[in-house]
Amino acid sequence: MGITRRGKDKAAAGQAVAGGASGGRARPKKATFETSKKKDVGVSDLTLLSKVSNEAINENLQKRFEGREIYTYIGHVLVSVNPFRDLGIYTDQVLDSYKGKNRLEMPPHVFAIAESAYYNMKAYKDNQCVIISGESGAGKTEAAKRIMQYIASVSGGDSTDIQQIKDMVLATNPLLESFGNAKTLRNNNSSRFGKYLQIHFNSVGEPVGADITNYLLEKSRVVGQITNERNFHIFYQFTKGASEHYRQMFGIQKPETYIYTSRSKCLDVDGIDDLAEFQDTLNAMKVIGLSQEEQDSVFRILAAILWTGNLVFREDDEGYAAVTDQSVVEFLAYLLEVDPQQLIKAITIRILTPRSGEVIESPANVAQAMATRDALAKSLYNNLFDWIVERINQSLKARQPTSNSVGILDIYGFEIFEKNSFEQLCINYVNEKLQQIFIQLTLKAEQDEYAREQIKWTPIKYFDNKIVCDLIESVRPPGVFSALKDATKTAHADPAACDRTFMQSVNGMSNAHLIPRQGSFIIKHYAGDVAYTVDGITDKNKDQLLKGLLGMFQVSQNPFLHTLFPNQVDQDNRKQPPTAGDRIRTSANALVETLMKCQPSYIRTIKPNENKSPTEYNVPNVLHQIKYLGLQENVRIRRAGFAYRQSFEKFVDRFFLLSPATSYAGEYTWQGSYEAAVKQILKDTSIPQEEWQMGVTKAFIKSPETLFALEHMRDRYWHNMATRIQRMWRAYLAYRAESATRIQTFWRKKRTGAEYLQLRDHGHRVLQGRKERRRMSILGSRRFIGDYLGINASSGPGAHIRNAIGIGSNEKTVFSCRGEILEAKFGRSSKASPRILIVTNSKFYVVAQMLVNGQVQITAEKAIPLGAIKFIGASSSRDDWFSLGVGSPQEADPLLNCVLKTEMFTQMERVMPGGFNLKIGDSIEYAKKPGKMQVVKVLKDSPNPVDFYKSGAVHTQQGEPPNSVSRPTPKGKPVPPRPITRGKLIRPGGPNGRPARGTTNRTPQPRPGGASASAVASRPVPQAQPQAQAQVAASIPVRTQQQSQTSSASVRAPPPPPPAAPPAKAKIMAKVLYDFAGQKENEMSIKEGDLIEIVQKENNGWWLAKSGNQQAWVPAAYVEEQKQAPPPVAASRPPPPAPPAANGKNKPLPPAKRPAAGKKPASLQPRDSGMSLNGSDGSRSNTPTPSLGNSLADALLARKQAMAKKDDDDDW
């Protein structure tokens, strides 16, 4: 198997290292501690064993088997030990974990082999094959199924054809298992045939077809099995699960009725449900596409085979074979659709054609007749099996052009029994051919890699088994197969004479790997010496039906038999047909030719015990398998040069932590080439020069111990970092919890009421721009909540109303609120009375609340089915009145008033999808009396903002335009950002406790009382007006030289002058977003695009604005505040005068004179609002105190700038 290659990551390629020799390639990712790493059991790759021997391999496999690790690598070869239990390692989660992963990234697994094969096929357009070998019961079939499962899962494709191909490929497993598998002493589900499944893919890696080639079906099992073994599964499935139709048509009875299924005294198997598996077989036939007629034909042949076994013969008076039960002959003839006399003649009469050309009919004895009977059954089953495989191939034929393929070979492993015959010779011959492929591809690839990488190495000596393959298959000089054919040709009429002739040919062969013995011969295979018995071997090689049976098939009335046996019998043709040896040689060479065109992967399966126990590990038996599978040779070949080799990039990615020159705090810091980085790592880890070599693209490590040392140092690196990682992890948990809380808070604010907002927007479409709107109806904060009274609640006032009026549990309230109904008064004008309006999914309720005997009584005054409402009448004005046009002959239509009318209409449209009819006109129509329509006028003459009904008319005011839509949702009150300080990942004041980056250029103003003279002198002082400066200086007393000497040796600098007055407060300007017409005297009319000044802001949605000489209120949602320009920086003041010299040369100024009585001192400049003559401690310190607004804004700005920058990693 070739090395799994991975294409360069395009995303990572963009982050290439600039300037280094490795520029253009992705740098290694930051290293992370493998917290979920599972402790290794033994070694996962046998090439890493310190001592290579069969016993050491066996011990390592035993450790891993007992630790529930059944897979082990030998380089790229996978060794699999059958666990005889479900380890839970084939789930979808495990399968997904291997997708897109390199073999070295994950533990050994059959999915890794499948991923490697599929990836190389797709990425590099190489045909792939997976060769699975091992003895019966070692898990070959299971491994093949898992590879098919993985490829079907990862190969993609959503089209119907591709999914159908996948289903059919998976359906081949139960179908071929039922016809090709059987219970043996060593395996309850042993494959008694070999198969090579090729899955064909298109150019994008989607399966578009498949084909199957079968090898070496053990057809002798049809007619006989040893005790406690079974025939093929299908016979027991069919006899136990056949339908009544089949039982009547084909005479199917229980398996104990038939000799072929009951002779071995084993009808049932633990863990196998024949009835359930028969249904799986039938389902697989349907998936693959077998018609009912084809299925009937298949089961007819199976029934014929079963009844063939019940033909029993006895000797007649002349010693020839005679049938015991004629009824069996007649029923078998019925199944085969031939004449009963012709059938019995074909079995009991042998047709001989000597060299003279004369046709001789020779009666058969009992033994010969039984042999012919069994030959008939074996031929029927063998040809039926071949037809099923061919039929599967027809269904799986590619339906579009193919690009590449992945092949799966599941075939017998070496068989060495006490008595070995022709079957074992064929099986072991095929395994020799596969071993030859393994040697040529694996060892040759190893040698080519050393030459390509220019590595100094010792040439590997190995046994080339080509000499053994030639011994078996050669034509000149003749090999074993040719000798078998020649012996049959020489003495074809006498099997014993054929065997003797063949043995003479074997004795005449000269080959170091062939040892003739008396009645047998030994071939030295690569897996061990095998002694083959000569008795009967030539007869098995002929593998021919008698011409009488072939002639009977040609005259059968069953067309399916003609399909199974298409060849016409030429009685005059005495040319010898191809033998079984010829066919297996041709098939094996074709298989080798196919595999040589592919990139192979190998799976060696091992059976741990003979008892199918999940805990038993039979050391001698496994050791025997290790020897004949050649695992030790595989390890030695892999280790002959170097035990470990890896590309420079991957080596650096794995071990860059071990050198301080290539890493810092888990980050890759090397700026040079990857090759130089490898040398630096090996140098810093003190690996001797003789333990490694540098190739052209790879680094080679000589011994496994060196690799173990590197891995140990890498693991210890993380142990040394454990404390720091734990601390950071706990901090991260606190940080994550705080972040999650903030995200949840934001999400709740964002999502709350979203569906109500959508419903509100739908309300505009319900009105269709035909009705004027109220200003409050189109506010941005308006939501259509629906059930305002809580009628759907389980408790509270709403539940009390629901129970009082009897709303059923199957009714859901979609709208409820308080409104009014127009009640007619006798002799005077109608009057609006309060009511509760409820809309459910089926009815419209008008609920009245009355006080009866001091108790509130709630009754449903009207309960109108929604289907009875013919129309809803409303005016085009902004009023809230509407009518329900019911047209009842007994009651008048209700005329209602509801301030949430638009929402009510919207909810009613939802529950009345087919019958909702909203009539909007200049007036409102309704039946004031049954059958008598009346028109209610709507007049826009009301000085009152509230609508009212009077004298048959509704009086209202002018509303918003009918095409008005809801205003944008007003923005929430801005909240200053607050950094997450939980977990100490971000500390107050900036990351890592340092001052926030946004405040580094801001110089704090020290308090004058605590500053030294030099500090004060060095601080820039804002400039002041000369007059103010002189006035301030005149008011400050100055010490004399004597005073300075008595108090302190240092001279205190005079305090700085006060800062300049703050600039005038900037105007707040806003831009008008929408037109607004003022309805009242204190409301300002504005137009879109105007700029206005905001004088005052209120939290009720209205701002006091000023435009020119007009000052009035405007809606806050209609304007957008403009960002203000930063205030100008005040000009700096001149520095204070220098302190007087201490040497007395400069005469000090005299103290200021006190003001004369009755005179006021000169007035000072007004002080800045930020100055205070009274400090917070009660002193008369003039420390400048910045205003609260400016300091808060500055702090928020600094914090925001600190949060916006990346986290500082110096904490590491």
UniProtKB/Swiss-Prot annotation:
<dbReference type="InterPro" id="IPR001452">
    <property type="entry name" value="SH3_domain"/>
</dbReference>
<dbReference type="GO" id="GO:0000146">
    <property type="term" value="F:microfilament motor activity"/>
</dbReference>
<feature type="domain" description="IQ 2">
    <location>
        <begin position="740"/>
        <end position="765"/>
    </location>
</feature>
<dbReference type="GO" id="GO:0071933">
    <property type="term" value="F:Arp2/3 complex binding"/>
</dbReference>
<feature type="region of interest" description="Disordered">
    <location>
        <begin position="947"/>
        <end position="1064"/>
    </location>
</feature>
<keyword id="KW-0518">Myosin</keyword>
<keyword id="KW-0677">Repeat</keyword>
<dbReference type="GO" id="GO:0007015">
    <property type="term" value="P:actin filament organization"/>
</dbReference>
<dbReference type="Pfam" id="PF00063">
    <property type="entry name" value="Myosin_head"/>
</dbReference>
<keyword id="KW-0378">Hydrolase</keyword>
<dbReference type="InterPro" id="IPR036072">
    <property type="entry name" value="MYSc_Myo1"/>
</dbReference>
<protein>
    <recommendedName>
        <fullName>Myosin-1</fullName>
    </recommendedName>
</protein>
<dbReference type="Pfam" id="PF00018">
    <property type="entry name" value="SH3_1"/>
</dbReference>
<dbReference type="InterPro" id="IPR010926">
    <property type="entry name" value="Myosin_TH1"/>
</dbReference>
<feature type="domain" description="SH3">
    <location>
        <begin position="1065"/>
        <end position="1124"/>
    </location>
</feature>
<dbReference type="GO" id="GO:0051015">
    <property type="term" value="F:actin filament binding"/>
</dbReference>
<feature type="domain" description="Myosin motor">
    <location>
        <begin position="41"/>
        <end position="715"/>
    </location>
</feature>
<dbReference type="InterPro" id="IPR001609">
    <property type="entry name" value="Myosin_head_motor_dom-like"/>
</dbReference>
<dbReference type="GO" id="GO:0000147">
    <property type="term" value="P:actin cortical patch assembly"/>
</dbReference>
<dbReference type="GO" id="GO:0051285">
    <property type="term" value="C:cell cortex of cell tip"/>
</dbReference>
<keyword id="KW-0009">Actin-binding</keyword>
<comment type="similarity">
    <text>Belongs to the TRAFAC class myosin-kinesin ATPase superfamily. Myosin family.</text>
</comment>
<dbReference type="InterPro" id="IPR036028">
    <property type="entry name" value="SH3-like_dom_sf"/>
</dbReference>
<feature type="region of interest" description="Actin-binding">
    <location>
        <begin position="405"/>
        <end position="487"/>
    </location>
</feature>
<dbReference type="GO" id="GO:0016787">
    <property type="term" value="F:hydrolase activity"/>
</dbReference>
<keyword id="KW-0547">Nucleotide-binding</keyword>
<keyword id="KW-0963">Cytoplasm</keyword>
<feature type="compositionally biased region" description="Pro residues">
    <location>
        <begin position="1125"/>
        <end position="1140"/>
    </location>
</feature>
<keyword id="KW-0728">SH3 domain</keyword>
<comment type="function">
    <text>Type-I myosin implicated in the organization of the actin cytoskeleton. Required for proper actin cytoskeleton polarization. At the cell cortex, assembles in patch-like structures together with proteins from the actin-polymerizing machinery and promotes actin assembly. Functions as actin nucleation-promoting factor (NPF) for the Arp2/3 complex.</text>
</comment>
<feature type="compositionally biased region" description="Low complexity">
    <location>
        <begin position="987"/>
        <end position="998"/>
    </location>
</feature>
<keyword id="KW-0067">ATP-binding</keyword>
<feature type="region of interest" description="Disordered">
    <location>
        <begin position="1115"/>
        <end position="1212"/>
    </location>
</feature>
<dbReference type="InterPro" id="IPR027417">
    <property type="entry name" value="P-loop_NTPase"/>
</dbReference>
<dbReference type="GO" id="GO:0043332">
    <property type="term" value="C:mating projection tip"/>
</dbReference>
<keyword id="KW-0505">Motor protein</keyword>
<dbReference type="GO" id="GO:0005524">
    <property type="term" value="F:ATP binding"/>
</dbReference>
<dbReference type="InterPro" id="IPR035535">
    <property type="entry name" value="Fungal_myosin-I_SH3"/>
</dbReference>
<dbReference type="GO" id="GO:0031097">
    <property type="term" value="C:medial cortex"/>
</dbReference>
<feature type="region of interest" description="Disordered">
    <location>
        <begin position="1"/>
        <end position="35"/>
    </location>
</feature>
<feature type="compositionally biased region" description="Pro residues">
    <location>
        <begin position="1053"/>
        <end position="1062"/>
    </location>
</feature>
<dbReference type="GO" id="GO:0045160">
    <property type="term" value="C:myosin I complex"/>
</dbReference>
